[in-house]
Design a protein with these regions (language model features):
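Charged, alpha-helix-forming regions
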Residues: 1-224
Length: 224
């Protein structure tokens, strides 16, 4: 397994007056799925209680196999989530830094996890994560830009046009030209329409307007 790229303290997003900077190993779309499934499980707990689950149950919920390699993959993902450092600046006035999205204990014999969620990070996802959203993401496998857009747009009503250059930068796309990226963007948005994640979109020369219902977050890059 190749190592995930390590990020220096870098501005990942600046939307609606909130700047998000990231330091550490780059999180990916699979990490987002693990995190949001844990957040979903937390909704079923009383406030303040830890989240518990078996590796087998988590992998099954994510639609993955349950063999040794998948268990190792989950360990890697949990370690990335536990090691991430995120700094949030609100309207240029207040900044808050947080080490890790979560803390966890794992029983190596039973492969059962006990997870303590970081309160400030959990608040960023306070709108929750529905089963419908999870099913939508399952349909977007092998479509990294569509997956990233699904996570990004879930936290934005996007009633105003978004600059295509901004989406290009925030998504981490490897498209070398704006023309190439606009083509990829159109295909990704068409995929979101097809699964019912957004109602519609309009792309003009340098911006795109999207009609949808907001939900989750934009902290994960697409890696494309």
């Amino acid at each position: 397994m190749s190592a995930s790229p390590t990020k220096k303290r870098t501005l990942l997003a600046s939307v609606d007056g909130i700047e998000v900077r990231f330091l550490g190993v780059q999180l990916n779309q699979s990490d987002l799925d693990v995190w949001m499934q844990i957040v979903h499980l937390s909704r079923q707990q009383l406030p303040g209680y830890n989240v518990t689950f078996s590796a087998h149950a988590m992998l099954t919920a994510l639609g993955k196999g349950t063999g040794k390699s998948q268990h190792e993959w989950l360990k890697e993902s949990m370690a990335r989530l536990g090691g991430a450092f995120v700094e949030m600046t609100f309207h240029g006035r207040d900044s808050f830094g947080e080490k890790g999205f979560l803390r966890y204990y794992r029983d190596e014999t039973t492969q059962r996890y006990v997870v303590e969620l970081t309160e400030s990070m959990l608040r960023l996802f306070e709108d929750g994560y529905t089963h419908i959203e999870f099913e939508q993401r399952q349909k977007l496998r092998k479509q990294p830009l569509a997956l990233w857009l699904h996570g990004f747009l879930s936290s934005h009503a996007a009633r105003y046009p978004l600059k295509i250059t901004t989406i290009h930068r925030l998504s981490g796309s490897g498209a070398q030209t704006l023309r190439d990226f606009k083509y990829r963007l159109r295909k990704a948005l068409e995929a979101l329409v097809a699964i019912g994640a957004i109602d519609s979109f309009v792309i003009d020369e340098d911006s795109v307007k999207i009609k949808m219902i907001p939900k989750t977050s934009q902290l994960w890059k697409s890696g494309i």
